[in-house]
Regions:
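Interaction-mediating elements
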Residues: 1-132, 136-154, 159, 164, ...
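Gram-negative/organellar outer-membrane beta-barrel architecture
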Residues: 10-19, 57, 99, 115-272
Length: 272
């Protein structure tokens, strides 16, 4: 069953394709515009590709008549469409990910094996993988090739790993009782190649000692629930009137819960 067949509820694929044309503003009524006709043909072809009909043939036909009823030149426009079989996604492969796990990358996909091929969702998946910022850019466009005689497709996403972590550190020395101070910062947005993030920040010196540790998981237990845990300890010393020191220790958590009735990517954040 496919939602674009003759038995499906709602408008047919052809009706929706024609609707794309009618929504576009064009030249004055009754005036033929070759550029807009070509654009309309491209949109019809795109509509078929997004429903899996990548082998469909859309041939624009322009028939010129010498004169119409009002003695004006007239053209008749139509498309000759051969739909053929829709393409089903047979297999999806990931290549070149020497460090990042397949599971991490596949979570970015809007298509899965068994789906009817959809060009827009393929493009969205490709962009989502690039937005991870774990791979060199520009990211090659996915390879598609026939999988069998029925015209089903195998899709391959190719990536090339790049360095993602960072380490920052520094030190300073001051006189008049200030002493030695410094900072260390470590951040890895692709911890263990699992798309999890870990960061550590430490500022230290005679009068201050701040420590912060954060861990983020975008898919807790392989679910669509994300989470962040942070722990911190802050110590400040005062040398005015023997005020002593102030120490604060704490932690925070945040959960991102999916809201599927709004959209697949929408989440609701809950913090404590």
């Amino acid at each position: 069953y496919y939602p674009f067949g003759a038995d499906a509820a709602g408008p047919t694929l052809t009706e929706r394709a024609v609707g794309l044309i009618r929504r576009r503003r064009g030249p004055p009524k009754g005036v033929f515009d070759r550029t807009r006709w070509d654009e309309a043909t491209e949109r019809v072809q795109g509509a078929y590709r997004n429903e899996g009909y990548i082998y469909a043939r859309v041939a624009p036909v322009v028939e010129r008549r010498r004169f119409g009823a009002d003695s004006q030149p007239v053209v008749d426009l139509r498309w000759q469409i051969e739909e053929r079989q829709p393409a089903i996604i047979n297999r999806i492969d990931i290549a070149g990910n020497d460090y990042t796990s397949d599971e991490c990358i596949r979570r970015q996909l809007s298509i899965v094996p068994g789906d009817v091929f959809n060009q827009d969702r393929l493009l969205r998946s490709w962009q989502s993988i690039g937005n991870l910022n774990f791979f060199e850019t520009p990211l090659p466009f996915p390879d598609t090739k026939p999988a069998n005689d029925e015209g089903d497709l195998d899709i391959t996403f190719r990536v090339k790993e790049k360095r993602t972590g960072s380490i920052n550190f520094g030190a300073s020395m001051g006189g008049a009782g200030i002493g030695v101070g410094g900072f260390i910062g470590v951040d890895q947005p692709n911890l263990f190649g699992l798309c999890k993030r870990g960061s550590l920040n430490w500022n230290f010196g005679r009068w201050v000692n701040d420590f912060n540790l954060t861990y983020q998981d975008p898919a807790i237990n392989k679910s669509r629930v994300s989470g962040t845990v942070s722990a911190y300890r802050t110590l400040s010393r005062y040398n005015i009137a023997n005020f002593g020191q102030n120490t604060r220790t704490g932690a925070s958590t945040r959960l991102g819960l999916p809201v599927p009735w709004l959209s697949y990517w929408t989440t609701l954040g809950v913090s404590y």
